Amino acid sequence: MCFGVLLSGHYYVMVHLLWKLYYIIGRGLGLLTLLMWKEPEIESPTPKTVTSISWYLLEELCCLFRFIYSIQNRERKCKNGPSPNKRGSASGCSRRGGGRGSGYKTLYRDLCENKPTPELWTLQAPELNL
């Protein structure tokens, strides 16, 4: 059902989600691979670092699922029409302007990009080369 909504004309959303998923997987594998190499500064990855990376990846994946769920809810509301006590843009469905996919960039930014920076990225960690 998720992919049916994404394939129904929301090309921006679909491309952005695929890119984000690729980024999450690549970033996680890259960091874990970097931690596994035996370098002079790093004896082995600390459990705290691995846990931080795991929580970061889990947060990103949950964010993507929240975004897909929000898209489905928006589509369902628009298909069923506005509720009797909500008119116009308050219903979440614009009748004019924007076209399909409008507002999804803002929705994604509100759900995913305006969240606090995970502790891992705020640490001074020269071994991670961040």
Swiss-Prot record:
Domain of life: Eukaryota
Span list, region Disordered: 76-102
Additional free-text comment from the UniProt record: Partially overlaps UGP1 and YKL037W.
Protein name: Putative uncharacterized protein YKL036C
Organism: Saccharomyces cerevisiae (strain ATCC 204508 / S288c)
Lineage of the organism: Eukaryota, Fungi, Dikarya, Ascomycota, Saccharomycotina
